[in-house]
């Protein structure tokens, strides 16, 4: 799935209008990769599923402007079940909160148009978790070193949670 996402992005960056893309085939493939809990597998061969593939699926549907082939309600439920007591999101329900998976979760919710449906308490908990990641830069989870990668993910989260800061 990530290869499809990457290729679509390259086409778009190259100025392609995606008119040559077999949208129906891509969307059918996504539908076949969605599991009954709303998550997505990377491929039929790689049975693992986590928030990265939920993000990729939402992004592919956004790029193709078509969410009809997937169960967006189940997808949203899966994302929300992955929120931890800390307010951030794990790769899957019950897993540790992580900067990258939190970005994938909130970005997917934004693409689904479901971010506005989060209550303020949920947003506040996530905002607090993000602010606790700051030392000299951001880390991706408690008791970890600051890292350029996580500084990017947490920085992007701030833009998702506070869109008025889009030019920071």
Label the predicted regions.
Residues 1-19, 42-70, 85, 90-125, ...:
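An alpha-helical repeat/solenoid feature that recognizes helix-turn-helix modules
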Residues 19-21, 25:
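Short, flexible active-site-proximal loops enriched in glycine and acidic residues
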Residues 26-31, 37, 79-80, 126-130:
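Buried hydrophobic core positions in alpha-solenoid tandem helical repeats
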Residues 39, 78, 88:
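Conserved beta-strand positions that form and line the central face of beta-propeller blades
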Residues 73-74:
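C-terminal beta-sandwich interaction modules and adjacent acidic
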């Amino acid at each position: 799935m990530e290869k499809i996402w990457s290729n679509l992005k390259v086409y778009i960056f190259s100025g392609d209008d995606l008119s040559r893309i077999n949208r129906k085939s891509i969307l059918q493939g996504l539908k076949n990769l969605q599991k009954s809990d709303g998550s997505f597998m990377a491929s039929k061969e790689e049975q693992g599923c986590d928030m990265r593939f939920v993000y990729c699926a939402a992004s592919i549907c956004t790029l193709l402007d078509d969410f009809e082939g997937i169960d967006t309600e189940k997808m949203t439920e899966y994302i929300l079940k992955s929120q931890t007591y800390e307010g951030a999101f794990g790769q899957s329900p019950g897993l540790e909160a992580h900067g990258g998976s939190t970005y994938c979760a909130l970005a997917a919710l934004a693409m689904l148009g479901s971010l506005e449906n989060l209550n303020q308490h949920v947003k506040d908990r996530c905002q607090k978790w993000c602010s606790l990641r700051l030392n000299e830069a951001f880390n991706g989870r408690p008791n970890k070193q600051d890292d350029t990668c996580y500084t990017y993910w947490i920085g992007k989260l701030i833009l998702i949670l506070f869109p008025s800061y889009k030019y920071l």
